[in-house]
Amino acid sequence: MDKTWAEVTCEIPAAMIDLLADFLVELSGNGVSIDNLELDTFSLDTMDEAPVKTVRAYFTPDDELEEKLAALNRFIQEHAPAYGDAAPAPPTVTTLREEDWATGWRQHFAPTRIGRKLVIKPTWEPFSPEPGDLVIELDPGMAFGTGTHPTTRLCLEALEKLGTAGDVLDVGTGSGILAMAAVKLGAQRVVGTDIDPDAVAVARENCAMNGVTAELVTTPLADIPGQFSVVLANILAEDLVRMAADLTAKVAPGGFLILSGILVERESYVIDGFVSTGLTLAETTREGEWSCLLYQAGQ
Ligand SMILES: C[S@@+](CC[C@H](N)C(=O)[O-])C[C@H]1O[C@@H](n2cnc3c(N)ncnc32)[C@H](O)[C@@H]1O
């Protein structure tokens, strides 16, 4: 008999996307898709204006599906009112055949423009770049970092604004998305490190697919030699604070440190954790519940 999937569709307030997506990934063990991340319709401005978003998750129909759907409905009913939806609709379920799932899942991903020049494009999508566009090909679903998460987007925007004429260090490289963007934006030398060897393997494949050269390693941060004009770290707030001295030591005089992965409510915790480093907080950018801090080292 053909294998089938249960496609579960949730209509939720836009500001609740991250919360629900995390819950769904945990519950289903699969990735999720979010509508309206298309190139033409998505921008940070329109995201705030769009009141409702569609999030889809994919479950294998098994004995636990009913239970999981009930847990999902409870989660939505409990949390959506805090985001302004007093009467959230329960999720709907459609059964998909394996072959429809394989193509149906893909249809929810489209090329996404981030900042002015960067475009993240799924490998299967045709795309005609504008002059000056820097296109990164990336398939969702392997390592963290497909450009759809606000913490990644905030880093990419910061990186594009800074320009990357010198050397760049990407701490917690995941899919390698930030490392690849740094190369495309003109960095001379890019080093990406991750504690997860699988992520490094994926990042290497992605770099090869995009024809970019970066040094991708599992070397612990403290053991990476040299200093860099830009250091990026999109990891958890607690890790950023724990690694504050090592991250700072890697920033060249006058260079920049971009910190992401910080919930807005944890922003002051991270800022406090970097006070003793001597770096200057140059800019704070936010998207939804996520915050990104840009620090600069003295000359
Ligand atoms: C949120 S993902 C970021 C991926 C990508 N850089 C992006 O911006 O989308 C965080 C990554 O950091 C890695 N990581 C966590 N702690 C780390 C550490 N102490 N040193 C290096 N990598 C770390 C994780 O394995 C994961 O791949």
From Swiss-Prot:
Family of this protein: Belongs to the methyltransferase superfamily. PrmA family.
Organism lineage: Bacteria, Pseudomonadati, Thermodesulfobacteriota, Desulfuromonadia, Geobacterales
First-listed, main subcellular location of the protein, grouped into a coarse class: cytoplasm
Amino-acid positions noted as binding S-adenosyl-L-methionine in the UniProt annotation, renumbered to this chain: 152, 172, 194, 234
Enzyme Commission number(s) from the entry: 2.1.1.-
Free-text function comment from the UniProt entry: Methylates ribosomal protein L11.
Record protein name field: Ribosomal protein L11 methyltransferase
EC class of the enzyme, as a word: transferase
Xref: Pfam families: PrmA
Catalytic activity as recorded in UniProt: L-lysyl-[protein] + 3 S-adenosyl-L-methionine = N(6),N(6),N(6)-trimethyl-L-lysyl-[protein] + 3 S-adenosyl-L-homocysteine + 3 H(+)
Keywords (A to Z) from UniProt: Cytoplasm, Methyltransferase, S-adenosyl-L-methionine, Transferase
Gene3D superfamilies attached to this UniProt entry: Vaccinia Virus protein VP39
Subcellular location, record wording: Cytoplasm
GO molecular function: protein-lysine N-methyltransferase activity
GO biological process: methylation
GO cellular component, one term: cytoplasm
Lineage: superkingdom: Bacteria
